[in-house]
Amino acid sequence: AAPGPERGVVFQNHSLLPWLSCFDNVHLAVERVFGATETGAQLKTRTAAALDLVGMSHALHKRPHEISGGMKQRVGIARALAMEPKVLLMDEPFGALDALTRARLQDELLGIVVRTGSTVVMVPHDVDEAVLLSDRIVMMTNGPAATIGEIVTVPLQRPRERVALAEDPTYVH
């Protein structure tokens, strides 16, 4: 399924439109989803809030070529989260981010899922990230003909917090 009002996608590569500003890249998605039910001012507020959430409010008017790769990824994440989709598909969304931003956005994602009831399907390569964010982990075999290797249920209580997870005796590093 392609991106749409009920499906947000965060690609491994940011996939921003190069001729639009950071604000306009996010606003395009917000307008598509909420344009029929919200005023222009509400749409702008929602867009600005999404960019603020990912720490990009300082770059609203910059175009993708004017910001770093990690910043581009944050704008892509803001675009998907601003849509409040029922299903959020994420392909290594935090891989290009610095550790502090990654941790903050992981925590924000946990909160957004609780608030919106969204389902997240994510492809991470970081085991700790998978355990923190997931209820079930589907492990794949290696190679071009990859298949499902094992499905693991994460037995840790929700809500999950990073610090509490590290101290939980059932969590083995």
Residue ranges and their predicted role:
Residues 88-91:
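Catalytic Walker B motif of ABC-type/P-loop ATPase nucleotide-binding domains
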Residues 10, 77:
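Hydrophobic anchor residue at the start of the ABC signature
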Residues 11, 23-31, 44, 48, ...:
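Short helical segment in ABC ATPase nucleotide-binding domains corresponding to the A-loop/adjacent helical element
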